[in-house]
From Swiss-Prot:
Involved in transformation (genetic competence for DNA uptake). One of its GO terms (biological process) is establishment of competence for transformation. This is Competence protein D. Keywords: Competence. Coiled coil: none annotated. The keyword Cytoplasm does not apply. It comes from Haemophilus influenzae (strain ATCC 51907 / DSM 11121 / KW20 / Rd). Gene3D superfamilies: 2.30.30.830. The keyword Transcription regulation does not apply. The gene is comD.
C-alpha cells in the first residue's frame, strides 16, 4: 500500500512539472504568433479577381461577398498587430489585417479599433475620392 501511495504521488508530481506561464524568461513565442500562423493558413488567394483601377489587391479576402453581407464578430489587438474577424452569411470567418483588401467592392481595412473596423474604398477615374464604411459590434 505504501508503494502505491508513493507511485501515485510520483505520478502527480511528474504531471504537474512544466513551464511556469508567468516566467518571462521561459517565453519564446506569443499567442499572437500562433494566431498569425492560423491566419496565414486561412488566407484566400484568388487570382481570378478582376483588378480595380484604384489598386485593389488580387489576394482579396472574401472577394465574392459584398461588404454589407459581412459581420464583425471579433477583434484581436496586440502591441504590434491587430486583426479583425469577419463572418459571412455562410458562417465562414475571415481574418484580416490593417491594409488588406476586403470584399467584392475592394475596400481596404484602414483602422481596427476595439469596437469597430473602418474601411475605405477609392472612387473615381483617377481615384481622387474615397468612400468610408464602418462595421461595429
Amino acid at each position: 500500500m505504501k508503494h502505491w501511495f508513493f507511485l501515485i504521488i510520483l505520478f502527480f508530481m511528474n504531471c504537474s512539472w512544466g513551464q511556469d506561464p508567468f516566467d518571462k524568461t521561459q517565453r519564446n513565442r506569443s499567442q499572437f504568433d500562433n494566431a498569425q500562423t492560423v491566419m496565414e493558413q486561412t488566407e484566400i488567394i484568388s487570382s481570378d479577381v478582376p483588378n480595380n483601377l484604384c489598386g485593389a489587391d488580387e489576394n482579396r479576402q472574401a472577394a465574392e461577398i459584398p461588404l454589407n453581407a459581412l459581420k464583425l464578430v471579433g477583434v484581436v489587438i496586440s502591441k504590434d498587430k491587430a486583426f479583425a474577424l469577419l463572418q459571412d452569411q455562410g458562417l465562414q470567418v475571415y481574418s484580416v489585417l490593417e491594409g488588406v483588401d476586403v470584399a467584392q467592392e475592394g475596400y481596404i481595412v484602414e483602422k481596427i479599433n476595439q469596437n469597430n473596423v473602418q474601411f475605405m474604398r477609392k472612387l473615381g477615374e483617377q481615384c481622387d475620392s474615397s468612400e468610408w464604411k464602418k462595421l461595429s459590434f
